[in-house]
Amino acid sequence: QFNKDSEVLDKVKKDLNKLTKSEVKARFITKFSESPDCINLNTLRAVNTKPNQVYCFIGFRSICPVTSQPDFANIYLTSGSALNASWLIKYFKSYAERGDFHEHCVESMFEDIRDQFQCTSLEISGRFMRRGGIDINPTRSSSKKLFFKNFRFFNQ
C-alpha cells in the first residue's frame, strides 16, 4: 500500500532501474497532448490527398511476429505531395496478416509511400494500442523537426 504518489513513483523507478540495469527517469503525466485534427482516409471520397494535410487511417492491423497476436493502430501521415487515397487504403489493409514489429511497419510504410509517390517530404506516425502496458508509437519523418508530437488517441 502506498501513502503518497511519490512512493509509487519511487517504486516504479526502482523496479525499472533493476529491470533495465540503467538509470530510469519517471514522472506522472497529468495532461496528454491532443491528437491532431486529421482527415479520415477510411471515409475520404477524394481520389487524391492534398499536400500538407494530415490524414489518418483508423483500424490499422498487423500481426506480432513473436506472439502472432494482432496489433492495432491508427496511422497518421502528412506529405508535401498529393497521394492516391485508394492506394493508401489498400496498402494499409495489406498489413492485416503481415507479421512485423511496429517500428518496422512504420519504416516500411515510409519507404514504400515515399518511393511510390516520389515524396520530397513525408512523415508517418503509428499510434499503436498498448499491449503489456508498453507504449510503442514509432514515427518516421524526412524532416528533423517532427510534425507529430507524442500524443495519444482515445483508444490507446
Pin down the residues of each PLM region.
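N-terminal intrinsically disordered, cationic/polar leader segments
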Residues: Q1-Q156
